[in-house]
Amino acid sequence: MSQFSELISFIRKEINYSLKKLPIPDTPNYLYEPIKYALKGGGKRLRPILTHLVGRAYNTDPNSLMNISLAIELLHNFTLIHDDIMDSDTIRHSQKTVHHKWDTSTAILAGDGIYTIAQLVLNSIDRYDKEINKCFNEVT
């Protein structure tokens, strides 16, 4: 395996670990169970990996960089939940989509909850700047 491949693998593992460690409450279960379900679905994590690589190139603080990468991945999951509803998809990453496992209203609420978590992750950046939030919201 090349050094670059090893780096990508390492970053992916760190992102997956950090996603699992997000402080997502257990109650109310009807809200947080679908959120946790959506986030454990996996995927390539391409967006946060690219974000991480660019941040490393600019010597971004590692903690801030991880939070930015997590926020990007959370934003992506938010859009996937809503996209699955719009496209009537029933499977995402080899598991039932959130709206198919629960219902459309729960899926919309879970997607919105993930977006809120992404905002909280961004706000936890030590050198948080309103420009970060502005850029993030323009992407959405």
Residue ranges and their predicted role:
Residues 1-23:
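N-terminal amphipathic/basic leader segments beginning at the initiator methionine
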